[in-house]
Amino acid sequence: MDLWQLLLTLAVAGSSDAFSGSEATPAVLVRASQSLQRVHPGLETNSSGKPKFTKCRSPELETFSCHWTDGVRHGLQSPGSIQLFYIRRSTQEWTQEWKECPDYVSAGENSCYFNSSYTSIWIPYCIKLTSNGGTVDQKCFSVEEIVQPDPPIGLNWTLLNISLTGIHADIQVRWEPPPNADVQKGWIVLEYELQYKEVNETQWKMMDPVLSTSVPVYSLRLDKEYEVRVRSRQRNSEKYGEFSEVLYVTLPQMSPFACEEDFRFPWFLIIIFGIFGLTVILFLLIFSKQQRIKMLILPPVPVPKIKGIDPDLLKEGKLEEVNTILAIHDNYKHEFYSDDSWVEFIELDIDDPDEKTEGSDTDRLLNNDHEKSLTILGAKEDDSGRTSCYEPDILETDFNANDVCDGTAEVAQPQRLKGEADLLCLDQKNQNNSPSNDAAPATQQPSVILAEENKPRPLIISGTDSTHQTAHTQLSNPSSLANIDFYAQVSDITPAGSVVLSPGQKNKAGISQCDMHLEVVSPCPANFIMDNAYFCEADAKKCIAMAPHVEVESRLAPSFNQEDIYITTESLTTTAGRSATAECAPSSEMPVPDYTSIHIVQSPQGLVLNATALPLPDKEFLSSCGYVSTDQLNKIMP
C-alpha cells in the first residue's frame, strides 16, 4: 500500500512538472516528501539531501538502537561515509569526548546498536550524524523515553459461555509478554491493548489497556469470524510497540436458529408507528369531544336566573315588569313592617337616668292637643286586622292558664274617650283616698275594662298574678308612672326594616276632676281578668256569685246578642258593672316592669315582650277549663 501511494505521488509530481516546467519541481518534491512522512512516519527524507535520524528505540530498557536515512544522493556516496557519534553525561557534567557508534551491524543497515554495556538509564544521551567530517543531524534523549516493547507472543482464546438464544458467545484471549522484556523481575512494567474486528471489516474495536496478560471479550456472534491482535507499551508512556500476530477466532454455530438472528424484529419502527397512532387517536378524541372536554376543564359560569323571571327582562332593563312578577309571587314579596304593629325588631332610645329625672319622653311628647289612648299592659294593639291566639305553656300542663284570643267587640269612639277620662278620674281618687284604700280587701280589687280602638286587638295575658297586679298598679299609682314610658307606638322605621317605638300617653298629675263620672267596677277576684275575649266556666260562676242581683241600666252597657255563640268581654264587663259602686278600690304600689326585650316571636306579624326581673308574689296557677257557651251563661246568670 505504501508503494502504491509513493508511485501515485510521483505521478502527480510528473504531471505537474509537465504543465509548469522546471519551476514547479522543488515544490512538488517537498509535497511528496510530506506525503511519505504522513504515510510512514519512519521514512523521513531530507529535502536538502543530507542524512537524518528516523527513530531511536529501546525494547526492554536494557539496550537501544538508532536509525537514520542516507539522503537523496545515497547512491553517490561511498559506504561508511556517514558516521554516528554519541556523548553522555556522567554525574553532573557532560563528557567532552565524542565517541563513535560501537555496532553498525546488529540493528541493521543505517543503524547503530547500543548493548547493555553502553546503556545507562536515567542518564541523558546526545547523538549526531556526520558526513565527510561535517555534522548533518543531532538528537538528545534518555533511554526510558524511547522504550517501545516488542509485540506479545503466544496469543490464544478460550470459550467462556454461550447465550441462551445460541446467538452470542463470550471468549477470553490470552498471550505472553515479550520474551526480551524482564517483566517477571519487575524491571519493566507493561500495559497491553487488545483490538478485534470482524473479518472483512476495516475498523478495529479497541479495548481499555490492562496490566494482565488475558482479556475477556463479550457478545461475539457465533456465525462470524473475528481477528484479534495485541500490542504493549511501558506504563505511563504514550508510545506503543509493534502489534502481535493476528489471531483468528471462529465460533461454531451451536443453535440451528442462530441464522434467524440476522432478521431483527423492527422494534424501533413499531414504537415509532405506535406513538404516531396514539397521537392521531388522541387528537381525534379531542376534536370529537371538544365541547365536553371544554366544559370539564373550563366549566361555564352560571347565568344568574330567578325562578319565574325571564333573563331577557333583566338584560333589557325592564324593571317594572320584573317588579310586577315579584309582586305576584308570595316568596318574593317584601314584608312591610310599617303596616303592622307587631314587628320582630325593636329599637329603644335609652336615656340617661339624669335625663329621665328632668323629664320623661311622655312629658315631652304628650300634650292636650295630642291625646292618645292608654295602653293597658294586659292588651296589645293590633292594626293588622288579623286575629292571633297565643297559648304559652306553663309547667307542662295540657292547657294554658288563660286562653287569649282576639275580641270581636267594637266600641264607639265616644265610649273610648269616656273610658280614658274614667281612668284619669280613678287615678286622682286613689291619690286622695290613699289612707282608706289600705283597708280594702285583696279579693275586691277592681278590674278596669277599656276598649281602646275600634280595631280588633290581640290580648296577651300571662298566667301569673304579677302581670295583673302590674296593670292595676300602673293605673292606680300615678307617682310610679312619673318617669316610666310606655313604648306602644311606632315613631320611625329604619332602612333595615326595624321600627322605633315612642312613648304613649300617661296620666297627668294635675287633673283633679273629670267630665265623665262613669266608673266601671268589677267585683270579680284579682285572678279573673275581664279583658279576655273568652273566660272559663269556673271564673264566670265566681264572678256572678259575687255580683249583687241588681240590674242597673247604663248608657254604655251593650246588650247581649243572642246570635253570638260566645260571650264577649265587653258584655260581661257591662253586666258586672251595673251593680258595682262608684268608688275604685285601691291597689298596692308595685314597681312597673319595663317591656324592652322580646320573649317569643309568634309570627312575622306578632311578638311577646319580656318584662324585667321584678319581685313576684306567690304564683297561683289556675286549672284549665273550657269555654262557657251562651245557653250555659244564661242559666248561670241571675
Curated annotation (Swiss-Prot):
It comes from the Eukaryota. Glycans are attached at N46, N115, N156, N161, N200. SMART domains: FN3 (SM00060). Residues 294-379 are annotated as: Required for JAK2 binding. The keyword ATP-binding does not apply. It is found in: Cell membrane. Residues 1-18 form the signal peptide. GO terms for cellular component: cytosol; external side of plasma membrane; extracellular region; growth hormone receptor complex. A motif (UbE motif) lies at residues 340-349. The soluble form (GHBP) is produced by phorbol ester-promoted proteolytic cleavage at the cell surface (shedding) by ADAM17/TACE. Shedding is inhibited by growth hormone (GH) binding to the receptor probably due to a conformational change in GHR rendering the receptor inaccessible to ADAM17. The WSXWS motif appears to be necessary for proper protein folding and thereby efficient intracellular transport and cell-surface receptor binding. This is Growth hormone receptor. It comes from Sus scrofa (Pig). The gene is GHR.
